[in-house]
């Protein structure tokens, strides 16, 4: 009898907790997010002329010289990391390959910022450091036949400051910077 009583209580508890944590809690939190944070709750989608062109939260692959490039991705801009340790020969070779490529494309530079060499942990980081943007300004300006000053002005407009004045570092959202380039100086069609 005690055994059946324990089973009955366990099943009721399972059903109640499933209802609370599996149905009610997700509905309440989703409703709260959509009510008070509609832009963020829908994925921070960037919409231009009625068309979704990306998300502020997810990196996109830009390969044309006319655009700023994001951090490299271990999984070709899908979620995931290489999980290679710092002693991994494959990781070292990949970093050297990236460094060689970047220095060839930016011959006036001698040092590559670390965030352009190392993939982000998630593979989806949409930001680069201000140093990485400055590293690329000459290439982007030459490719678009603009002055570095014109590009620098846009970089300064989209640069995000540290949160709450002390958390993290300044950063630049690559998608927003490239969209700003297109809106100010025209879309590159090649």
Swiss-Prot record:
GO terms for biological process: potassium ion transmembrane transport. It is a single-pass membrane protein. GO terms for molecular function: ATP binding; P-type potassium transmembrane transporter activity. The keyword Transferase does not apply. The keyword ATP-binding applies. It comes from the Bacteria. One of its GO terms (cellular component) is plasma membrane. Keywords: ATP-binding, Cell inner membrane, Cell membrane, Ion transport, Membrane, Nucleotide-binding, Potassium, Potassium transport, Transmembrane, Transmembrane helix, Transport. Its main location: membrane. The chain crosses the membrane at residues 13-33. It holds the Pfam family KdpC. Belongs to the KdpC family. The system is composed of three essential subunits: KdpA, KdpB and KdpC. This is Potassium-transporting ATPase KdpC subunit. It comes from Leptospira interrogans serogroup Icterohaemorrhagiae serovar Lai (strain 56601). The lineage of its organism: Bacteria, Pseudomonadati, Spirochaetota, Spirochaetia, Leptospirales.
């Amino acid at each position: 009898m005690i055994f059946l009583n324990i089973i009955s209580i366990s099943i009721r508890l399972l059903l109640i907790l499933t209802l609370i944590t599996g149905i009610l809690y997700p509905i309440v939190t989703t409703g709260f997010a959509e009510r008070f944070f509609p832009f963020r709750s829908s994925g921070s989608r960037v919409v231009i002329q009625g068309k979704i062109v990306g998300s502020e939260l997810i990196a996109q692959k830009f390969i044309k010289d006319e655009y700023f490039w994001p951090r490299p991705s271990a999984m070709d801009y899908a979620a995931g990391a290489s999980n290679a340790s710092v002693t991994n020969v494959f990781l070292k070779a990949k970093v050297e390959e990236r460094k060689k490529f970047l220095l060839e494309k930016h011959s006036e530079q001698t040092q590559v910022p670390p965030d352009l060499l190392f993939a982000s942990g998630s593979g989806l980081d949409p930001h680069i450091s201000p140093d990485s943007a400055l590293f690329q300004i000459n290439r982007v300006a030459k490719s678009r036949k603009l002055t570095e000053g014109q590009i620098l002005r846009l970089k300064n407009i989209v640069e995000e400051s540290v949160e709450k004045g002390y958390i993290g570092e300044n950063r630049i959202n690559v998608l927003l910077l490239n969209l700003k380039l297109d809106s100010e100086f025209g879309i590159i069609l090649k």
